[in-house]
């Protein structure tokens, strides 16, 4: 039976779904190779799990679909989904410890959301200027 693992990662309103299966070590994000996806900053953010454990995806093809949110929110959702998939694929507690020691949000969703705007102001906490005379 073919080994396939599905994982997901979330950040703000971005949701990334990753599928890992045996292959040649190709990583695709929204059908685009990771080497040509987005800007350099987003590629570096997504590649963090790969830098921590260099041979983690050798022999694994990773397909990630991400939607919602902004550029960096999507990048952080993708890196969470990728790191979770790598840990599940190898089933190695040492890998999990390396990721948790580096950054907890590699394996745990960052559930912080934007605070909603309130009336009588321009944002969540800021109020319109008041004049007394």
Question: What are the language-model segments listed below?
Answer:
Residues 2-9, 16-21, 25-67, 83-133:
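Structured, basic alpha/beta domains of bacterial-type, RNA-associated proteins
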Residues 71-79:
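Beta-rich strand-turn-strand
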């Amino acid at each position: 039976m073919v080994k396939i693992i599905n994982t997901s990662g979330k950040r703000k309103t971005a949701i990334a779904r990753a599928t890992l299966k045996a292959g040649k070590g190709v990583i695709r994000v929204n059908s685009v190779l990771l080497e040509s996806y987005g800007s350099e900053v987003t590629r570096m953010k997504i590649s963090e799990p790969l830098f921590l454990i260099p041979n983690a995806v050798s022999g694994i093809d990773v397909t990630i679909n991400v939607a919602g949110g902004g550029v960096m929110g999507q990048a952080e959702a993708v890196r969470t989904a990728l790191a979770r998939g790598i840990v599940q694929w190898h089933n190695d507690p040492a890998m999990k410890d390396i990721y948790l020691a580096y950054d907890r949000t590699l394996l745990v969703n960052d559930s912080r959301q934007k605070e909603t705007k309130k009336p009588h102001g321009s944002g969540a906490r800021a109020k319109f200027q008041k004049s007394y005379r």
